[in-house]
Amino acid sequence: DEAHCISQWGQDFRPSYLKILEFLKKLPYRPVLTAYTATATAEVRDDIMDILNLRDPFVLTTGFDRENLYYAVKRPRDKYRELLSYLKEKEEKMPGSSGIIYCLSRKNVEEVCYQLREDGFSVTRYHAGLSDEERKENQEDFIYDRKKIMIATNAFGMGIDKSNVRFVLHYNMPQSMENYYQEAGRAGRDGESAECILYYSPQDVRVNQFLLDTKENMGDFTEEELQNIRIQDRQRLRKMTQYCTTKKCLRKYILNYFGEQTAEKCKACSNCSEEYEKTDVYPIAADILGCVKEAGQRYGINMIVGILAGAD
């Protein structure tokens, strides 16, 4: 399972997975081998087959389109205020809804969990800094609906199959489309409508870039291998950032990323469902450029702004 971990092109390459090959070679005969993953691009799928030396394999791709999921990207000035407003509205419309809020760091998890608890929400938390016992208890509280909202890092989710999750909200931008798709995909597994909302800010890009640049060498990689992995990580981060800033259909972006095609508009994402007002800005732009040209280099930007605004 999680076969993408065997590929250096995958978003979560683990050198320990390469030991599978050593194990297979020691067996008296080669058994039938199956490899499963929910988040592999065509490139990664080919790499998995090559590394495992799969002979004429039967490849089954079930598709990446989850039609019951609504995708949205928001750029709030105050993320917590936006989150609080969303949860209050959700509670009014669908009381007791279960949801997951993913945060980039343990600190974010602790802060958001504390604030939501203070605001009266049924919440629990999950990250690698908690003891095994507390993580297990918190996970079971969420799975069995003793707590309605889980606030967690990406440490939460492996093997979790809670069917009635009505929303997955990312408080920070993840590092890759693979991570986002996997985490957002924990919503709506009962087939009913669910929402996948991402709160984006440019600061998320800088933080993720820092985390990638300072990531420790956990796999005894050579410097060349480590450099190649970092290049792949940066490319994935760019694709994730493009998802957060595109004006095109979000569902189409996700499916195209994983090598699938779809209609131009899905009408089930924030970009397709929002109506934009078209405005001819040519006259305004012409006034600005004309003023700058007339002023030459005699005045600074504040003076130019003042002139355009009609200041004395």
Label the predicted regions:
Residues 2-224, 235, 259-262, 271:
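Helicase motor core with emphasis on the C-terminal RecA-like subdomain
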Residues 24, 49, 255, 305-309:
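Residue-level preference for well-ordered alpha-helical positions
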Residues 29, 247, 297:
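Flexible coil/turn residues that form the inter-helical turn or adjacent wing/linker of helix-turn-helix
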Residues 82, 239, 287-290:
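Pre-recognition alpha-helix immediately N-terminal to the DNA-recognition helix
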Residues 87, 142, 244, 292-296:
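Short helix-to-turn junction characteristic of helix-turn-helix DNA-binding domains
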Residues 207, 218-223, 232-234, 250-252, ...:
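Accessory DNA-binding and partner-docking regions appended to nucleic-acid-acting proteins
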Residues 228-258:
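Short, charged low-complexity linear segments at domain edges
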